[in-house]
Amino acid sequence: MLDLKRIRTNFDAVAAKLKTRGVSEDTLTTLKALDEQRRALLVQTEELKAQRNIASAAIAQAKRQKKDASQQIADMQQLAANIKAIDAKLADIDQEITSIITVLPNTPHDSVPIGADEEDNVEIRRWGKPRQFDFDIKAHWDLGEALDILDWERGAKVTGARFLFYKNLGARLERALYNFMLDEHLKEGYQEIIPPYMVNHDSMFGTGQYPKFKEDTFELDGTSFVLIPTAEVPLTNYYRGDIIDGKELPIYFTAMSPSFRSEAGSAGRDTRGLIRLHQFHKVEMVKFAKPETSYEELEKMTANAENILQKLELPYRVLALCTGDMGFSAAKTYDLEVWIPAQNTYREISSCSNTEDFQARRAQIRYRDEADGKVKLLHTLNGSGLAVGRTVAAILENYQNEDGSVTIPEVLRPYMGGLELIKPR
């Protein structure tokens, strides 16, 4: 959430930045007008309360002197009524301000490229060269079925579209991948967490999913719980409402969890395969950092995600997302896209973001600066390290062989009992 004081004092600069994210200046002008009304009413109510205190003292004195205080009592009753009326107006204005400011996206960092959509993202670098096949390649969903390791038909029967069963060596490959990913992150100083897979509405608000993106989630009827769309939500909210000792920062968390997404608005997109599912595993990275080091931490986090792809020897590229394509809470985002041969393109497999103090303000996550003892908002960062199902898809396609088998990446073999190939049964 943005700082209302910052909007008030730097209105033109904030408006210019939010315009690059699709926010109209009219919205901010309305917010500014409401803020001015609120501040004026606060002055009025303070003046009235001061008058009420004077009237109260006059009544007390009149009673001590056994004089008639009926006029002062009437005056105080009128003051109380006026204060109550202003408080009601303030409550309405506060609600209007909240309804606007909670759905405003974060302002982009100065280094973020300005653009409207994914076409304006900027490629930063590439790693690895896409393999040149000398045979007709198969898509990962066809490979998965032929190898008897992925079963979409029964997933659809048991649950519905965009669900599947991993089976046999498919289940083992998925498990090997997330164990490998977690082990790599632990080497980089992350603390492993197993979080709740359901959170409350306050947690969803804290990380920015609520109120704007409720339609993208699965809420449990009759409860206040929501299935997590990403482990970012419980990991970040771990410190919601807390004040952390500044000496402990930065703090790194990593977790493997299922992620649940309704995929509202994705009808007709990626209807086959592992790219877009309602339920999938993802290894998440979350950081809590001081403002002065958060962008250094973003580069490290992105490198942590790249490390996984490099050790799996999967070609990828890194993009700096433009203002129009970044997520709601992000101030800056790098996307990692892995090469998917059957689609002859790169597809997103990780997104690493610095939200600066946007989530910290919503969730009231603060730290006590050891230098001056002051309590300040920290910066939160999050990134995929990686989306496991999409990594399975990339391995099946990039490591496929002409005979229909799939070579297991060397770094995963210790996690699969030394197995080197997944062969057709």
From Swiss-Prot:
Catalytic activity: tRNA(Ser) + L-serine + ATP = L-seryl-tRNA(Ser) + AMP + diphosphate + H(+); tRNA(Sec) + L-serine + ATP = L-seryl-tRNA(Sec) + AMP + diphosphate + H(+)
Residues reported in the UniProt entry to bind L-serine: 230-232, 284, 384
GO process annotations (BP): selenocysteine biosynthetic process; seryl-tRNA aminoacylation
GO molecular function: ATP binding; catalytic activity, acting on a protein; serine-tRNA ligase activity; transferase activity
Enzyme Commission number, as recorded: 6.1.1.11
Positions bound to ATP: 261-263, 348-351
Pathway: Aminoacyl-tRNA biosynthesis; selenocysteinyl-tRNA(Sec) biosynthesis; L-seryl-tRNA(Sec) from L-serine and tRNA(Sec): step 1/1
GO cellular component: cytoplasm
Source domain of life: Bacteria
Secretion signal, residue range per the UniProt entry: none
Cell compartments where the protein resides: Cytoplasm
Keyword annotations: Aminoacyl-tRNA synthetase, ATP-binding, Cytoplasm, Ligase, Nucleotide-binding, Protein biosynthesis
Enzyme class: ligase
Family listed: Belongs to the class-II aminoacyl-tRNA synthetase family. Type-1 seryl-tRNA synthetase subfamily.
Function field: Catalyzes the attachment of serine to tRNA(Ser). Is also able to aminoacylate tRNA(Sec) with serine, to form the misacylated tRNA L-seryl-tRNA(Sec), which will be further converted into selenocysteinyl-tRNA(Sec).
Subunit structure of this chain's protein: Homodimer. The tRNA molecule binds across the dimer.
Domain statement: Consists of two distinct domains, a catalytic core and a N-terminal extension that is involved in tRNA binding.
Protein name: Serine--tRNA ligase
